[in-house]
Every structure is written in C-alpha cells, then in structure tokens.
Amino acid sequence: MSVTPNPDQHVAQLIDANLDRAREGLRVIEDWCRFSLKNKDMVITLKNWRQQLGKEHYEIYKNARSSSSDQSAGLSHPAQKERILPQQILSANFARIQEALRVIEEFSRISHPKLSKISAQIRYEIYDLEVIILKISNLNMLDEKLKSCKLCLITRTHPELIKTVLLALKAGVTMIQYRCKETPDNQMIAEAKELASICKSYNSLFLINDRADIALAVDADGVHLGQKDMPIQTARKIIGHQKIIGLSTHSLEEIQNATSQGCNYIGIGPIFKTKSKQNDLSLGIDFFSKINLKTNLPWFAIGGINKDNIDKIKEVGIKRVAVINAIMGAEDPYLASKELLGKLKK
C-alpha cells in the first residue's frame, strides 16, 4: 500500500514519534511477559502487535523525524522516579501505548487508514490485556513475598495496636494478619485501612482474618480463613484471584485438603498450648517432621511459639512461624520481633 503523503510534515513527525512510543511500550510489556510471567501466548500476541505497527512505519514518517530539533524531546516527569515496583512500570507503559495508539488512530485516519484501523484494534484489545497482566503480576509478586516471609504477626485487641504493628514492621516482620474478633465492623475497617497503608509503605503483606469483605474493602493483600469460616471458593469470588488466601489447619487430613482447595498458604497448629485458643489440643513438635511430605504450599507453624522454644521447632525443619503474644504481649515489640527473626534466620 502507498501512503498518501500528508502536506503537513508536522503530522508525519507526530505519527513517527507515536509509532516509536507504542512499539517501545509494547516491547516493555512483552519482555515482562517473557521473563517474569513466562507466558508464551501473551508474548506472541504482543510481538504480533509490534510487528503490525512496524510494517506500517514507513519511510515517509522516519524521514520527517527531527529528534535533534525537538525542544520537548527527553522531557522527564517527577512521577517517573516513583515507579519502583514492576506494577507501576507496567501501568505506565500500558498508558503510554494506549495514548500513542489513540494519537496514531486520529491523525492517520485520512492519509493512512490501514494504520488507523490497526491502531484502534490494538488499543481496544490491550485494555483487556492490561487487566489480565496486572492481576497475574500482582499475584506473582504476593506469592514471592509469601515464600520469602519468615515471621507473621497476628494481631489481637491492643490499646496500642498501630504502634505495636509499626514497631514489628520496623524490626523486619514482613507479614501482618489483622485479627480482632470482638471489634465492631466500623472500627475494624478504620484500623485495617491504617494498617494496610503502613504495611504497603514497608512492602509487607497485609491480610485480614476471617473477613473477605473487609479485605476487599481496604484492599488488603488477602484473607486468612479458619476451618469453620466461608469456603475458599466463596472467598475467591469476593476478593478475586489476584489476592492470596490462607487457611488454618490442625491435622494431616486438613493439610491435604487445603492443597486441593486452592489456597496460597496454610497455618498449621497449635504446636504448643496457646492463650488465644486454650481449648485446642497441641500437635507437638514431632508432628511437624511429617509436614513436608504432605504439602508443597508455604506453611507457618503457629501456637505458643516464643523466643524460648523457637530453637526447638527449627530442629524439625520449621522455617516460617506465626505469633501473637510473643510480639503483641511483649514490653518491647521491636526487640521481640528482632530476636525472633534473628533466631529464624540462623
């Protein structure tokens, strides 16, 4: 096809610049899908879009290029320095692609209708792809955080709840589970919102105990369920597949069932007698020597764990623990967290 030359060279420059912008943005997303998501189908789709645009990137546009005389070339924006997470980079590049395609679509409609049509088609399809890729990327990021987590703090009602959690995060705790069973909903939401914001600033996971609705309302990273709470499938319908779900288990049978139900991690216990669940029988240390044979999910030992017994449980292969009173009941939550983490990392 021959392109009808546009008498206005500025339009040719504009199309050239936006073709470059769209193709570069597509390459950023493509490489993320290739190296991080390892999704061959997405890579093929994105590569095909790049090539479609490349075939229509005629010399008439490249010859009109004037980067050296463009006074706006190379302009930066303060927001660029704030893109520290992959999701932020992806979102910025999706927006870049969509905006560039819209400009191409508008200015090539008369002189290059084929390019205009291609740009419109890609733009509409990439809106849906953006949602899918960001959801998958978010879940992958949460899973990686989960796997690297050593210590989870489960909260309880406390007069200095926010301060205690903040001290734990400063000490290096990377997962907080908000658990306040007797707290009214309006107070739970207020506290959960503040905790979610704090955890985000420390790049730590934040989950809500039992309440998938509140987890969704405050944009928590997920929800932790007990055996008598709503089914995992129901929780998935509420919070979606881009969030993580944990499940409490108390026997080998429950551990095996959890693996097939679609949760992301499990809590196993109580390993010792605990103040929070005084009527539950403890599993004992020997029970945990069998766990790795039964599940590939990340799992946390829970129940009565403290600085005095944590060395014993490490001897049977326990790598992750969840605690309540060992930190929430400590005189110095910061030092208590540091001591537990130090023992876990030995």
From Swiss-Prot:
Cite the annotated pathway.
Cofactor biosynthesis; thiamine diphosphate biosynthesis; thiamine phosphate from 4-amino-2-methyl-5-diphosphomethylpyrimidine and 4-methyl-5-(2-phosphoethyl)-thiazole: step 1/1
UniProt key word Transferase: yes
Q: Which GO terms describe its biological process?
A: thiamine biosynthetic process; thiamine diphosphate biosynthetic process
| One Pfam short name | ThiD2
Summarize where 4-amino-2-methyl-5-(diphosphooxymethyl)pyrimidine binds, as residue positions. Answer: 177-181, 209, 248, 277
Positions of the region Unknown?
A: 1-125
Reaction catalysed by this enzyme: 2-[(2R,5Z)-2-carboxy-4-methylthiazol-5(2H)-ylidene]ethyl phosphate + 4-amino-2-methyl-5-(diphosphooxymethyl)pyrimidine + 2 H(+) = thiamine phosphate + CO2 + diphosphate; 2-(2-carboxy-4-methylthiazol-5-yl)ethyl phosphate + 4-amino-2-methyl-5-(diphosphooxymethyl)pyrimidine + 2 H(+) = thiamine phosphate + CO2 + diphosphate; 4-methyl-5-(2-phosphooxyethyl)-thiazole + 4-amino-2-methyl-5-(diphosphooxymethyl)pyrimidine + H(+) = thiamine phosphate + diphosphate
Tell me which SUPFAM superfamilies the record gives: Thiamin phosphate synthase
- Region annotation (Thiamine-phosphate synthase) ranges: 126-346
Q: What does this protein do?
A: Condenses 4-methyl-5-(beta-hydroxyethyl)thiazole monophosphate (THZ-P) and 2-methyl-4-amino-5-hydroxymethyl pyrimidine pyrophosphate (HMP-PP) to form thiamine monophosphate (TMP).
Family membership, please give it: Belongs to the thiamine-phosphate synthase family.
Protein's name in the database: Thiamine-phosphate synthase
Gene source species: Prochlorococcus marinus (strain SARG / CCMP1375 / SS120)
Name the gene that codes for it.
Answer: thiE
